[in-house]
Amino acid sequence: MLVATLALLVACQPRPARHEPVQAQEFDISAVAKSDGDMVVEINLRQSQRYLRELARKLYARNPNQLRRGRYTTHDTALNALFGPRRLTHYPGLRGKRSAQAIGLAFDEDFHGDRVAAFIEGLRTMLMDAYDGKDSFYIYDVLDPQKLHYLARNFEIAFWKLRHDRDSEDRLFLVSNSLYGGGNLSFERLAGKLIGLQDLMAKVVADGSNRQIKNVIQRVTSVVFFPI
């Protein structure tokens, strides 16, 4: 199971263009303290962050007014504020909110800030909470598979809200897929990948630690996020 998962996640990694030389990865002494499972977790987390960045890019493209709300001039500056190496611990303009509360701002009619940033930062911090706030993992690190399972369910709820939540004038807070027939399904694909990665990771961690995942049945339309 672990080997198959590692192979699947590696296959998801972006490949260099043909004209780009393949560079050997430098040896890192810290890798000695990593198990195969730790490497799977790190790959999964990095890939999830890439998907969130891609989701943010697409949402800004469909909702350019949110760039102006965030006082950004380009997609790149907005994305760097969310994901760049110099990003702030608390994203500005979200009233200090994060995780589920930040996602809630994206669909709050009284919020006049950048709704794309609120939605993405909420997902990003929720993701990091499920991975115990770490981006490197070692043999002694043990994740909670229940948190990862709840993360997948929370992503389902967040994407349901993205597709359905409207303001008092019946307008979507954020435009994602086209409202017309044959619309762009790229948002649906990204949502499916993000949810699927967390479900897969929850199972891998549960199997590796002999822990059971409690499946909680809840209607997505109840829009109550699970605590992580």
Which residues does each PLM region occupy?
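Long, compositionally biased low-complexity regions that are usually intrinsically disordered
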Residues: 13-17, 215-228
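C-terminal motif of bacterial Sec signal peptides marking the signal peptidase cleavage site
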Residues: 8-11
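Mature extracellular/secreted ectodomains of secretory-pathway proteins
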Residues: 69-202, 209-212, 216-220
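N-terminal Sec/ER secretory leader and immediately downstream segment
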Residues: 13-118
